[in-house]
Amino acid sequence: MSSVFLLYFRNVVLRIILGSCFFIGVTCLSSLVGSSEVLAEDVVPVEMTIQDKKDLKRVAVYLEAIKTLRGGFLQVSSNGRVSSGKIFMSRPGRLRFEYDPPESILMIADGLFFVYIDRDLEQTTHVFLKSTPLSFLVQEKIVFKGDVTVTKIERPPGILQIKIKKTKEPELGSIQLVFSDKPLVLRKWVVVDAQDIITTVNLTGIQTGIKLDPKLFTLPTKENN
């Protein structure tokens, strides 16, 4: 692949998994993805019904019960890019995304940082895990208030969808968690970034409660990268 294409793909991946400026801040990654100035807006919370509150409680209990997770992912962006790979999660705070060839992308969250590694470009990008949308999934206590605001809850047949935004920076985008219902299982998440690019990350072959090597979540050094 050409270096120009690899750089383009790097920016797309950052936008997709990290949510670009969403939950990060305009000055952090906007230069990478060429974002324009983002106008502030007020977050509008959904008017909660009794059923909404019950479902949010169910989701919180479900997510908190997932201590480890392993599976695959299929990533589809509204700009036409499709990628796949493997995902590993160890709560709280640890994630790993391994992209399938020909991409050379690796992402690791070690509890503090979320690190993007492009081996072909020999480039590494660090952001604080708490500034990314995925930090919500791996925090020890799942809370649908405070830093995040629930803006929509929908229930298509057999599905539960919950959309959240950053409470203090809603203009930067949203993440929607999509679950199959009865039993409750996380199936995918959908990120809409500040440039209105929509990215869906579908989970496949998910296993939970399995033993994972702690080294999966160790940040690579020059010797082992």
State each model region's role.
Residues 1-14:
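N-terminal secretory signal peptides that target proteins for export/translocation
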Residues 11-26:
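Sec-dependent N-terminal signal peptides
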Residues 23-37:
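C-terminal segment of classical bacterial N-terminal signal peptides
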Residues 42-63:
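Extreme N-terminal tail/first-helix region
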Residues 61-80:
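A short, Trp-centered hydrophobic/proline-enriched beta-strand micro-motif
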Residues 86-136, 205:
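An acidic-aromatic
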Residues 118-164:
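Surface-exposed, polar helix/loop patches in the mature regions of secreted/periplasmic/lumenal proteins
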Residues 145-149, 155-225:
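Gly/Pro-enriched, hydrophobic low-complexity segments
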